[in-house]
Structure formats: structure tokens, C-alpha cells
């Protein structure tokens, strides 16, 4: 922590009024403690539930550590999480944001899906709410942002799908595919990733047999299955299926006949399918057959191993990359919010908070606050999105999901494990 700020806080000079978005409580020692409310928008029961539950659990761990940090530094703050299940539904997400904002919450972690970000951006900007999403990856233009200024309250600690599209295209090439059928989720995120992926596939000389969109609320996959089966008929091993969507891929696979020719071809997924628990629970045998090679942003430090170990000890299993992203986001957001309150005498200032998050992301990455990043150096571009990153390639095996390779964003090469 910068000395000048820490000295003010530790020296007891800090004075803060109670604003709508914070509560003031009295500790056992009689000192005043300002509670910073943090909204957590995650999918706990929808198409991204595997990742949403991971984010909830890791934020609970972060909440404990941040509060301990504030206490040890003599800083009169405490963060308090307000968790809401959005089901990755844009309309539900907006309702949750509005409800939490009515409770005075002005800083949010999430939401997870790009369609959600797109749907709440108007409310975010008009009410000057600041958010950090760990997993929204659609390019800004696909979300309706025309300039970086319009997106100054929306941060994303993950690279956009311009990177992931390249990764998927290179995976297809490395696997020897010459022809592909692309099945994609018809929403802001799916459209963006599909466009970026197809562009890279074509650049790699891969023929696009068909591009098949599906409704995010789909239940019966039989029309998609029939169309894909007809398109792939008579094709050899150099033909594959690319699925751009969420964990509903498990339902799709489960509805495919055991003897279907679709299960004789390689499938490639994305970050919406990588490490999905639902896939293992509902369609593991079929997923093993098609491999379901899935890409996900990959950036971990030695510090991440400590958090992952604690995550496992609590019975939560293995945290995914987006859980690690939101862990870092919570730290940066909490430190920045506290600094904002210190600078304003306890008042909320969205423009200052936005500025501090951008600055403190660098300081946090460099360890200036005495806390180590779990996802490595976080460099943000002019749109407040993570500027670069490698992608892990995961596949379904008899032993579950396994990391089988890493795509290097600087070289475009894949290091297969």
C-alpha cells in the first residue's frame, strides 16, 4: 500500500460519513468500521452454474482475506458480499442489479455473461455503477459500446473473444480439421465469438460447412442434431463440430443417439464448456468420444496454488480460471473503493473509483499492496478489458477434464501436454 494513504488511515485521521452504499458499525474495541457493500452477480442455477458456484465460493474466501487485511492494516473497513443468482439471464440480471442498487450497492463483481453486461449497461451508466466482470468476453462493440468513454464503468479482467476465436481456430488447424460445422448460441456473446472464430478458421484454410445458431432457451435439440447429422454425412476424420455455447452442450450430447455418426467426429468447445461439471454428470461417455476440446483463458501464478488448495480443503473442488479472475477483481475493487472513500471523505464518486481501479490494477499486479495476484500481471487496454492472455485447452477423458495444451497468444502456437 502507498505509504501516504496507509499513514493517514493507520494514524486515525480518517473521517468518513455514512453514505447510502456503506454502513458504519462499531467493533468490540469501540472503533468505527465502514462496511463496503459489494454485489456479486453470478449464475448459480443456469447455463454457467459450474463457474458461477466457483465464483461464489472463491469470493467468500476473498471476503475473509480482505477483511483480515483491512484489520491488520488498521483500516476502518469491512467488505460485505451480496450474492444474487442471475441464471445468466440478461433480464433477471437487470432485475437483480436494480434491486441491489436500491439497497445502496454501487460496485459489483460480475455479471458473468456478455449478454447480461449488454442488457445492464444502460442502467450502469445512467446510475454511475462500477462493475468488474471476470468472464464477459464479447468485443465491446458487440455489447453496444461505441467508445472507451462509454465503457469507463465496465471493467473485464479477461481478454475479449478476439483472442479466443484465434485460439479455437488454431486448435482446429492443429487437430488436422479441414471442414467444420459451427453450432453457436444466438446472443451477444455467441455472435461475437462465432464471428471471431469463423474469421480465424477461414484464415487457416478451414472450410465452413454450415453455421447453425440456436436459441439460448432451447430444450429440444433434435432439429439441430438432425441438421448437423445431415451436413456431416459422408465426411471423414478431417471434419469436426465446433460448439460455441454454455453448459447446455451436456443436454445436446445426451440427446444424441449412442450410434450417431456425430460421435465419430472431433468436437471443439470454448470457455462456456471447459471444465463443465454438467458435461461429466450428464454426458461423460459421449464427451469422451468426441473429446470436446475446450478453450479457456489461462493465467495463474504460484499464489494461485495456495488459493486452489484452500478452495479444495473447503470441499469446493477445483476453481476455474474465471473464479481466479474474480478473486483478483474483488481485491482490486475493495482496495480501490476504500481509497476512494478516503479521498472523498466517505462519499461515492464513480469517476474516481473507475480511475483508481485502472491505476490499482497495475499496483496490485506489481504487489505494491502486499498482496499477490493469482492471475498474473493484469494489463488493461483503453476499453478497460484485459489486453492479452494465453488459453488453456481442456479435453474430456475417462478421468474427467484434463488440461491437454496451452495456446500462446504471442506466437499462435500450441504447447500440447
Curated annotation (Swiss-Prot):
Superkingdom: Archaea
Leader peptide range in chain numbering: 1-21
InterPro entries with a match to the protein in the record: BCAA_transport, Leu-bd, Peripla_BP_I
Keywords: Signal
CDD domains to which the protein is assigned, alphabetical: PBP1_ABC_ligand_binding-like (cd06346)
Stored PANTHER family: HISTIDINE KINASE, LEUCINE-SPECIFIC-BINDING PROTEIN
Name this protein carries in UniProt: Uncharacterized protein MJ1266
